[in-house]
Amino acid sequence: MERGYRKVRIGTVVSNKMQKTIVVAVEDRVRHPLYGKTIKRTKKFKVHDENNVCNVGDIVKIMETRPLSKEKRWRLVEIVKRAE
């Protein structure tokens, strides 16, 4: 039996102060339903970082997973680009 589809997002690390956890901000652009203006929306996810390899400013790929704690439902897949 095959696993269900898992969501994948790319975002920027905004905090790495916790142990084995990072906070990733994912930016999304949506059109306003009535006025048609494009709006930037940012959502923050708590992400499991097993080896504490991420730093603030890194661009990372994250994937949805089973609940790991009260707020963690995402895990780190790869670091797309390191911060300068």
From Swiss-Prot:
The keyword rRNA-binding applies. GO terms for molecular function: rRNA binding; structural constituent of ribosome. Disulfide bonds: none annotated. GO terms for biological process: translation. Transmembrane segments: none annotated. Keywords: Ribonucleoprotein, Ribosomal protein, RNA-binding, rRNA-binding. One of the primary rRNA binding proteins, it binds specifically to the 5'-end of 16S ribosomal RNA. Part of the 30S ribosomal subunit. NCBIfam families: PRK05610.1 (NF004123), uS17_bact (TIGR03635). This is Small ribosomal subunit protein uS17. The gene is rpsQ.
